[in-house]
Amino acid sequence: MDRFSLYVPNFLPKAEYFGKGHTACMGCGLALGVRLVYKVIGEKINKGKWEVPWKLGIFGVKTESAEAKGTSLLNINKGNGVKGKITICFDYEGINNLEVIKKHIPSLAVAEDFDYVGTASVGYPFDLIDKVKTGMESKGNSFLHILCPCPTNWGFDPDSTVKAGRLAVESNAYPLYEVVKGFYRVTVEIPKPRKVEDYIRLQGRFKKTGEEDIKQISQTVAKEFQKIKERV
């Protein structure tokens, strides 16, 4: 058993609002992301509005057909005297998402003048939980973008979901940061980043990706991360 599995469950909030009986696949990153968010939101989830293009069975939504678009949105009015709402984007990406490294969704949220914008990964649950709390408690509208690795679509072992979520962050392919009224702050610093190739090679969906493509993706990662650092 790794240290993550051994220690993390002991320090997470004990309350559970994400019950059994859903149809999520084994190792589903989306289900893990929803579970962590529910631990913070609690009973307020009853006031939430889902916009779910896929994985409908997880949320008890019945439909005849659903297209795997790669994202699900949850909108919740904050309440308790706090004006505004929080929008949470659970991003499990597409099967052949060659633009996996170029995450423009948080930038779009900043451009839309959200008062609080944050990125999170199921591989870093405490950072995720802290950002949900901040998003719920801060004044104005909040937006949280959560990376939820999908074993089925991405092509990795179901027991590697957390590993995929951590590698995304540790390689700077998916940096964790927050933007409060236009001010940037990196919330998880990686002193010695992993190779982007380690993150890519974990995923079967990129098995045909060549060395030259990986080199270009690595350069893109470096450039995008540098942009964020310059804004801090």
What are these model-predicted stretches?
Residues 42, 76-79, 133-137, 159-164:
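Short, solvent-exposed amphipathic alpha-helical segments in soluble enzyme
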Residues 89, 118-120, 143-147:
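Short, conserved beta-strand edge motifs with alternating hydrophobic and charged residues
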Residues 12-14, 21, 100-138:
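Conserved thiamine diphosphate
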Residues 150-232:
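Flexible, low-complexity linker and terminal segments
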Residues 1-100, 123, 127-130, 230, ...:
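Thiamine diphosphate
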Residues 139-143, 174:
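Active-site lining segments that contact anionic ligands and/or coordinate catalytic metals
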